[in-house]
Amino acid sequence: MATLFIADLHLCVEEPAITAGFLRFLAGEARKADALYILGDLFEAWIGDDDPNPLHRKMAAAIKAVSDSGVPCYFIHGNRDFLLGKRFARESGMTLLPEEKVLELYGRRVLIMHGDTLCTDDAGYQAFRAKVHKPWLQTLFLALPLFVRKRIAARMRANSKEANSSKSLAIMDVNQNAVVSAMEKHQVQWLIHGHTHRPAVHELIANQQPAFRVVLGAWHTEGSMVKVTADDVELIHFPF
């Protein structure tokens, strides 16, 4: 058996091929797993569980079917869907996890997270993140009419795209000191995360021992997952 990890699907109505690929994944590979972990940015945007977008209901039903089949499903918020709440989690059968979680997997201690908190060189993003994660601000935003939230979200995405276009690739990647600090804080030799869209397996030293950072790829023209078994930790890309 295996435990599966995915992230950064950025599901939206404008990308039906990705949605179709995810549905096939849920109906196939996911049903064979010990557990499925979604490490954020499942959706391109999330403005509240009350958004009647049919895509959201469709995805909730598909994930719920996996959960009902006996495969527990877990979710860590990303920078795009950090407002995904208890209502959607209940409808989809997912368990919401904190932004950093340590798992005991087949004899390994594995730290999982979305990954944006590791990009500490991007001071502008980290300041923005701290602001939008304030509970009072989230409560205020979610109390706004849906059409107002949609306008605000669209403006924020446009601003983010413009800001990122002028940033270096290095700034938007993880900070190595932040990586080591997180792994030593949790006393782990394995870290799995997404966010950067730079799939790879990196070797490093943490806790004065060899350690590994596995980065999930985004779902663009193919799927990406990490498959953890008793024998191996594999980063796998597969066609939709």
UniProtKB/Swiss-Prot annotation:
<feature type="binding site">
    <location>
        <position position="160"/>
    </location>
    <ligand>
        <name>substrate</name>
    </ligand>
</feature>
<dbReference type="InterPro" id="IPR010138">
    <property type="entry name" value="UDP-diacylglucosamine_Hdrlase"/>
</dbReference>
<dbReference type="Pfam" id="PF00149">
    <property type="entry name" value="Metallophos"/>
</dbReference>
<comment type="similarity">
    <text>Belongs to the LpxH family.</text>
</comment>
<feature type="binding site">
    <location>
        <position position="167"/>
    </location>
    <ligand>
        <name>substrate</name>
    </ligand>
</feature>
<feature type="binding site">
    <location>
        <begin position="79"/>
        <end position="80"/>
    </location>
    <ligand>
        <name>substrate</name>
    </ligand>
</feature>
<keyword id="KW-1003">Cell membrane</keyword>
<feature type="binding site">
    <location>
        <position position="10"/>
    </location>
    <ligand>
        <name>Mn(2+) 1</name>
    </ligand>
</feature>
<comment type="function">
    <text>Hydrolyzes the pyrophosphate bond of UDP-2,3-diacylglucosamine to yield 2,3-diacylglucosamine 1-phosphate (lipid X) and UMP by catalyzing the attack of water at the alpha-P atom. Involved in the biosynthesis of lipid A, a phosphorylated glycolipid that anchors the lipopolysaccharide to the outer membrane of the cell. Is essential for E.coli growth. Does not cleave the unacylated UDP-GlcNAc, the mono-acylated UDP-3-O-(R)-3-hydroxymyristoyl-GlcNAc, and CDP-diacylglycerol.</text>
</comment>
<keyword id="KW-0472">Membrane</keyword>
<dbReference type="InterPro" id="IPR004843">
    <property type="entry name" value="Calcineurin-like_PHP_ApaH"/>
</dbReference>
<keyword id="KW-0443">Lipid metabolism</keyword>
<keyword id="KW-0441">Lipid A biosynthesis</keyword>
<dbReference type="GO" id="GO:0005737">
    <property type="term" value="C:cytoplasm"/>
</dbReference>
<keyword id="KW-0997">Cell inner membrane</keyword>
<feature type="binding site">
    <location>
        <position position="8"/>
    </location>
    <ligand>
        <name>Mn(2+) 1</name>
    </ligand>
</feature>
<keyword id="KW-0479">Metal-binding</keyword>
<dbReference type="InterPro" id="IPR029052">
    <property type="entry name" value="Metallo-depent_PP-like"/>
</dbReference>
<feature type="binding site">
    <location>
        <position position="41"/>
    </location>
    <ligand>
        <name>Mn(2+) 2</name>
    </ligand>
</feature>
<feature type="binding site">
    <location>
        <position position="122"/>
    </location>
    <ligand>
        <name>substrate</name>
    </ligand>
</feature>
<keyword id="KW-0464">Manganese</keyword>
<feature type="binding site">
    <location>
        <position position="164"/>
    </location>
    <ligand>
        <name>substrate</name>
    </ligand>
</feature>
<keyword id="KW-0444">Lipid biosynthesis</keyword>
<protein>
    <recommendedName>
        <fullName>UDP-2,3-diacylglucosamine hydrolase</fullName>
        <ecNumber>3.6.1.54</ecNumber>
    </recommendedName>
</protein>
<dbReference type="GO" id="GO:0008758">
    <property type="term" value="F:UDP-2,3-diacylglucosamine hydrolase activity"/>
</dbReference>
<dbReference type="GO" id="GO:0009245">
    <property type="term" value="P:lipid A biosynthetic process"/>
</dbReference>
<dbReference type="GO" id="GO:0030145">
    <property type="term" value="F:manganese ion binding"/>
</dbReference>
<feature type="binding site">
    <location>
        <position position="79"/>
    </location>
    <ligand>
        <name>Mn(2+) 2</name>
    </ligand>
</feature>
<dbReference type="InterPro" id="IPR043461">
    <property type="entry name" value="LpxH-like"/>
</dbReference>
<feature type="binding site">
    <location>
        <position position="114"/>
    </location>
    <ligand>
        <name>Mn(2+) 2</name>
    </ligand>
</feature>
<feature type="binding site">
    <location>
        <position position="41"/>
    </location>
    <ligand>
        <name>Mn(2+) 1</name>
    </ligand>
</feature>
<keyword id="KW-0963">Cytoplasm</keyword>
<feature type="binding site">
    <location>
        <position position="197"/>
    </location>
    <ligand>
        <name>Mn(2+) 1</name>
    </ligand>
</feature>
<feature type="binding site">
    <location>
        <position position="195"/>
    </location>
    <ligand>
        <name>Mn(2+) 2</name>
    </ligand>
</feature>
<feature type="binding site">
    <location>
        <position position="195"/>
    </location>
    <ligand>
        <name>substrate</name>
    </ligand>
</feature>
<dbReference type="GO" id="GO:0019897">
    <property type="term" value="C:extrinsic component of plasma membrane"/>
</dbReference>
<keyword id="KW-0378">Hydrolase</keyword>
<comment type="pathway">
    <text>Glycolipid biosynthesis; lipid IV(A) biosynthesis; lipid IV(A) from (3R)-3-hydroxytetradecanoyl-[acyl-carrier-protein] and UDP-N-acetyl-alpha-D-glucosamine: step 4/6.</text>
</comment>
